Amino acid sequence: MMFKKCLSVLFTCLIFISSARAQLVIEITSGADQLLPIAVVPFGYEGVDALPEDIAQIVEADLARSGLFQPIPRSNMLSMPSKEADVFYRDWRLLKSDYVVIGAIKKLPNNQYRIGFELLNVLSQKPVQKHSSIDVSARNFRDAAHYISDKVYELLTGTRGAFSTRILYVTAEGDKKAPLFKLQVADADGHRPQVVVESKEPILSPSWSMDGRKIAYVMFRNRRPNIFIQELATGKRQQIAQFRGLNGAPAWSPDGKKLALVLSKDNNPEIYTLDIATQKLERMTNHYAIDTEPSWEPDGKGIVFTSDRGGNPQIYRLDVNSKRVERVTFEGDLNTRARMTPDGRYLVTVQKNDGNYHIALQDMKTGRVQILTETYLDESPSIAPNGSMVMYATTYQGKGILAVVSVDGLVKYRLPSADGDVREPSWSPYFK
C-alpha cells in the first residue's frame, strides 16, 4: 500500500514535465572501509517478451552507490535461484556473500507485472525479509527496483533508504556566452531526467516542498530575478516575489506553509518569510550587512543563513519567534550555503580555507568540524532525506558536475552530465 501511494505521488508529479535526453551517469570514486558482501541474483521470469528493465541490476547499482555494499558479480554466481527453496547456501558461503537478494517476475493482464523478492541471510540460512511482492506497470519498473533497494538498505543498516527519492538541478547548455538554462528533475541515480522549465536567462535555487508536490525557484526575466512556485503535477506556475531589487533563495518551511526568502526591496538584502496562503510578508532580519541563503531547521523553530555582519560571510541562526540572531560557524575563512541534517545534529556548509572551497560538516552539539570533500570549487550542498548523503555542485575536468559524499566522508561518487554544466542540486524529501 505504501509503495502504491508513493508511486502515485511520483507519477502525478511528473505528468506535465517534458522529456530530457541526457541523464547523469554515476562514477563511484570511494566507499566505506568495510563493505558488506551481497548478491543480487537476476530475477526469474518465464515470459516470452522482454522485460522493461533489469530489476536486479538496478538494485545492485543502488546498493553499490551507497558505498556500504559490495555486490557479487553475476559472472561469479554458482547458481541463480528465484525462490528460497532453490537456494544452496553453500554456494553463497563459497563466494563469501553475507546476504542474497532473490526474486521472480510474473506477467499479469493489462501490461502489469508482479515482482516478488526476498532477502536471505547466508550465515543463518533464514530470510531477513520473507517473500514480498508488488504489482507495477511496465513504466514503473525502475520505481519498483528503487523500492526494493530501500527495503534492503533499511533492513541491513537500520536507516531508511533514499533510492526512491528525486533530485532537481539546473543545466547550462549550448553557447557559453548565451547558454540555455534548464531546470530538470531526475531519479536520485540520475536516470529519467525531465525538463521542468527552461529559459535563456539564469535559473537558481530550486527547492522542494516537504510533500514533494511543489517546487520553488528563482528565474530571471529581463535580467531581473523573480521567485516562482510550480506544481509538478499540473505545471501551474505562480510568481510570488517580484519586488524591486533582489528576489532570491526561496526555502520551504518544514510544514510547507511558508517560504523563507531574500529580498532587497528596502535597500539591503534581508531575510523574510512569506505565508503562501495569505501572502503575508514578514521581515525577519534587520541589519546593514548582507543576509542571504536562508534554510529552515527541521523543527521550523529556527532559520540558518549566511551573513557578513561579522566581516567575512559566516553562518548565523535566527530564532523565528524572538528574531534573536547568533553566530554558528567560527572555523574557516568563510562559510556559506548552510543546510541542516533532518535530525538537526549536523550543519553542512561550503567552507573556504586557503582559497579552496569544500563541503564541511559541523556537529551542532560539539562544534567539531570535518571537511568532507577534496574536490574543486564545491558549492550548493543538499542533504538526502535520510541524512546519510550530501549532494553538491563542483568542477571536474573543467566542467560543472554534481557529486555526492556521505556525512562521514567515506563514500564519494560523481554524476557527470553529457550535456553542459550542471549546478544547483536539490534533493527531494520522501514522497508521502
UniProtKB/Swiss-Prot annotation:
Lineage top rank: taxon: Bacteria
Primary site of residence: periplasm
GO cellular component terms, semicolon-separated: periplasmic space
Subcellular location: Periplasm
GO annotation, biological process: cell division; protein import
Record has Nucleotide-binding as a keyword: no
Keywords annotated in UniProt: Cell cycle, Cell division, Periplasm, Signal
InterPro entries assigned to the protein according to its UniProt record, in alphabetical order: 6-blade_b-propeller_TolB-like (IPR011042), PD40 (IPR011659), Tol-Pal_TolB (IPR014167), TolB_N (IPR007195)
Annotated signal sequence range: 1-22
Similarity-based family: Belongs to the TolB family.
Annotated function: Part of the Tol-Pal system, which plays a role in outer membrane invagination during cell division and is important for maintaining outer membrane integrity.
Quaternary structure and interacting proteins, as annotated: The Tol-Pal system is composed of five core proteins: the inner membrane proteins TolA, TolQ and TolR, the periplasmic protein TolB and the outer membrane protein Pal. They form a network linking the inner and outer membranes and the peptidoglycan layer.
Protein name: Tol-Pal system protein TolB
